[in-house]
Amino acid sequence: MKIQLHKNGWTSIITDIDLRSASQQEMNTIAWLAAKDTVVVIRNQHLLPGDEVDVCEKIGACEQVMPPDTPTQGTKLVEGGRGKIVRVGGGNHHGGVAGVFEHVSDMDWHSNRTGTETRDPLIWLYGVKDSQGSRTSWINNILSYQDLDQELKEQIKDLNLPN
């Protein structure tokens, strides 16, 4: 496994790894990089949905969206994802049900349930098909906060996001 820091200074690029056979130590390193650098990019993987769940579970608990034996027809669930993977965007509408976040236009902004105190700290995105030309952008709020001047930090220090 080779690790390179992107020119932005906070994205790790990992090459020379097959996630299906990655050791627990390698997965722990990937998890540590995600916590440290916010975004980890690993390209050229050929994972089936069950492989994705296995890889993610080496990092930590995966959200159980629906019971593992739930039929995927007519849902946003991905076949073989054991009730833990949802389709994002369009494409194959299982029983007329589109994936989450299917939009004709760009989604300007969203985040991982910021109003939920116990939200899962990691989001896994895996482009399977029809992702050519799409773009996902990330912001590092830790660096954004660190870049604020001390006066503004003092003004906002007691702000809380209501649930």
Regions found by a protein language model. Give the residues of each.
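Non-heme Fe(II) oxygenase catalytic core, chiefly the N-lobe of the double-stranded beta-helix
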Residues: 2-163
